[in-house]
């Protein structure tokens, strides 16, 4: 039996590959012997990807062009691109959710059985059960512009555009798992707490130092995650080692959620 953690012979696609978690993931996939890595980003990645697609994932046309440009089939899609709420609301929701969903829809038919889709979500999206019924209605709206109109009609939800975008990603992971699973494709998401990347400054600007520092203190490490630590979980979820995982949102929070659920927060 081969190494279930290996990516030998696998073709993978990574969005948001130029920096932070995406860049760390590309480096890790090279170490794990990935056969072909397609990097999608608006900026040129420094890492050793085999194909680079410059893309604006905030627009439907940009996402469609990126999907069309992917060289050949892919066994694993890492939908990792994301922006903070320092960007306009529609940009946040488009990049963090609509682009992710559309790439999944376009690339999944080109995957073979045993393929995997891994979303980078966030612990900021764990409030989705409070909006479950509304978000399930959104999942049924496939048209990009109609989905944006739905967001416009729900200002009570879009007030926290980043949190909502990550709630959408987590619900989509659940929603799509049934249909994808029947085609032999798994979908999971990883939900990190704050990560020590250049984007952290944007989160501090929108979520406040007080909230982020509190979240970090609830974990046993007492510090933000590193990009490498998050990339390692993503790589696991996309590998054969996670072959029995489908439709799950995995916390990467050093125990913060456990503390919340058991009333042990500081």
PLM segments and residue spans:
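Conserved glycine-rich cofactor-binding loop
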Residues: 11, 18-19
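Rossmann-fold cofactor-recognition segment
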Residues: 47-61
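Short, small/polar-rich loop/turn modules that mediate ligand/substrate recognition or access, typified
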Residues: 114, 186, 245-247
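Short C-terminal tail/terminal secondary-structure segment
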Residues: 2-3, 246-266
């Amino acid at each position: 039996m081969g190494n279930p953690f290996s990516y030998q012979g696998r073709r993978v696609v990574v969005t948001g590959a130029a920096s932070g978690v995406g860049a760390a993931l590309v480096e890790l996939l090279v170490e794990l012997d990935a056969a072909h890595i397609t990097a999608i980003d608006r900026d040129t990645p420094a890492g050793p990807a085999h194909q680079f697609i410059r893309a604006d994932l905030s627009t439907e046309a940009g996402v469609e062009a990126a999907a069309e440009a992917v060289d050949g089939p892919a066994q694993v899609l890492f939908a990792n691109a994301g922006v903070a709420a320092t960007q306009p609301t529609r940009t946040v929701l488009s990049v963090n959710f609509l682009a992710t969903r559309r790439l999944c829809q376009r690339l999944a038919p080109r995957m073979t059985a045993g393929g995997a889709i891994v979303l980078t979500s966030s612990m900021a999206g764990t409030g989705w059960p409070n909006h479950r019924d509304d978000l399930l209605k959104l999942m049924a709206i496939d048209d990009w512009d109609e989905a944006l109109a739905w967001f416009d009609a729900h200002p009570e939800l879009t007030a926290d555009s980043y949190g909502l975008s990550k709630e959408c990603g987590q619900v989509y992971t659940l929603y799509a798992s049934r249909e994808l699973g029947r085609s032999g494709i798994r979908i999971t998401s990883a939900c990190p707490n704050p990560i020590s990347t250049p984007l952290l400054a944007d989160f501090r600007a929108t979520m406040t130092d007080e909230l982020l520092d509190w979240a970090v203190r609830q974990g046993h490490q007492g510090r933000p995650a590193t990009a490498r630590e998050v990339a390692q979980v993503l790589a696991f979820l996309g590998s054969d080692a996670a072959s029995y995982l489908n439709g799950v949102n995995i916390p990467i929070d050093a125990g913060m959620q456990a503390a919340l659920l058991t009333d042990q927060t500081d």
